[in-house]
From Swiss-Prot:
CDD domains registered for this protein in UniProt: IPMI_Swivel
Protein known as: 3-isopropylmalate dehydratase small subunit
A GO biological process held by the record: L-leucine biosynthetic process
EC number from the UniProt entry: 4.2.1.33
SUPFAM superfamilies the record matches: LeuD/IlvD-like (SSF52016)
Recorded GO MF terms: 3-isopropylmalate dehydratase activity
Quaternary data: Heterodimer of LeuC and LeuD.
InterPro entries: Aconitase/3IPM_dehydase_swvl, AconitaseA/IPMdHydase_ssu_swvl, IPMI_Swivel, LeuD, LeuD/DmdB_bac, LeuD_type2/HacB/DmdB
This protein's pathway: Amino-acid biosynthesis; L-leucine biosynthesis; L-leucine from 3-methyl-2-oxobutanoate: step 2/4
Reaction(s) the record says it catalyses: (2R,3S)-3-isopropylmalate = (2S)-2-isopropylmalate
Pfam families: Aconitase_C (PF00694)
Length: 165
């Protein structure tokens, strides 16, 4: 599984309250959440993002309130992957559960700039910055998590397993 796109870059401690503000949590419709994604930190995000783009951040991405609305909003906005130095653990699990690929890599998170063209190979964990001609070794998903991601989330994965029985 691979992702390829243009980078949208953010700093440390991007919390779920700025990914999708609480005032929009009355909806669970991914399309509606996508329209408000990153609104409090980057007003132009929804106008700039294209299908397949990649979000890069520094430390503790997805901290704050536990809400699956945050990874849903990011995924529905068109982002194909989030790269960060570290993720808040609850965000990490929520992202996997809804099928949003994420990968931890300190060097990539620090070196990749907004606007760079990046490709990620999730099977190997290799992140390639096509703009700068550099590669980084990120943390590859364990096999069971790769299966969840390929199924586009935990619920789809479980349904596939049930259908196979």
């Amino acid at each position: 599984m691979k992702s390829h796109g243009i980078v949208h870059k953010y700093g440390d401690n991007v919390d779920t309250d700025v990914i999708i503000p609480a005032r929009y949590l009355n909806s669970s419709d991914p399309k509606e959440l996508a329209k408000k994604c990153m609104e409090d930190i980057d007003k132009e995000f929804v106008n700039r993002v294209n299908l397949g783009d990649i979000m890069v951040a520094n430390k503790n991405f997805g901290c704050g309130s536990s809400r699956e609305h945050a990874p849903i909003a990011i995924k529905a906005s068109g982002i194909s992957c989030v790269i960060a130095e570290t993720f808040a653990r609850i965000f990490y699990r929520n992202a996997i559960n809804i099928g949003l690929p994420i990968i931890e890599c300190k060097e990539a998170a620090r070196d990749i700039d907004a606007g760079n063209e990046v490709e990620i190979d999730f099977d190997s964990g290799i992140i390639t910055n096509l703009t700068k001609g550099t590669s980084y070794q990120g943390q590859a998903f364990p096999e069971f998590m790769q299966k969840i991601m390929k199924a586009d989330g935990l619920i789809n994965y479980i349904n596939e397993q049930l259908e196979a029985v």
